[in-house]
Amino acid sequence: MSDDARPKPRLLREPGAYLRRQVRLKLNDAVRGLGLKVADSVDMGSLRTATGFRHVLDVGVARGTPDLYARFPEAEIELFEPAPQFYPGLETGVMRERSCRLHKFALGATDGEAVLHLAGATSASLLGTQDKPGRTFPVITVPVRRLDHVLRAADLDRPALLKIDTEGYELAVLQGAEALLPAIDAVIVEVHLGKAYAYRPQQILDILAPHGFALVDVLDTEVRNRRVTCLDMVFERPRTG
């Protein structure tokens, strides 16, 4: 069956997840024009599809995304994580339970190297730790690859899902994935709204829209001082036929 003929997944809300989506705050000016409301902590396990994704690309794994893996138990999983402190847990956890490949490098807009800030036991960032003033963290140099230099369309089983959570580096990951986006059926990206040194949310939309993606859902959000600082946006291509 050709890729075009494969059934395309459609992301739906579970009734319970829908009830949990009580409106608390409107999005700030960066995304208010989209006319969306903010979800109040709905995890990735609330995603449903008619057929299930066959390939999941988890970029910025850290300790893993178990709710996402559990939702699609038959999917092949590609794990992308440059921070070595997370490898033992991944190798004794999800990699023993599932069909996975661990890619021990960062993803970005160009191939090369970058400085990774190890911001504690649960976080790492290529953008530094400006949001943690007065604190210092160890740094290491890690390799960086473009996603579309690592995987080709022919390497993916369809439907395929791309999830990105890279602590403010999401735009660069998408810029390095453009040649692969035609083979991706849905994208979940953590979008940051309050980091002046990161990107504008509109830039995420500008990359995905030309490839036919539309914003269809908003999952878990982070709110600080009654302002949304980041949220998980779900994009997919409209169903046809």
Mark where each language-model region is.
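Phosphate/nucleotide-binding beta-alpha loop and adjacent structural elements of enzyme active sites
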Residues: 2-241
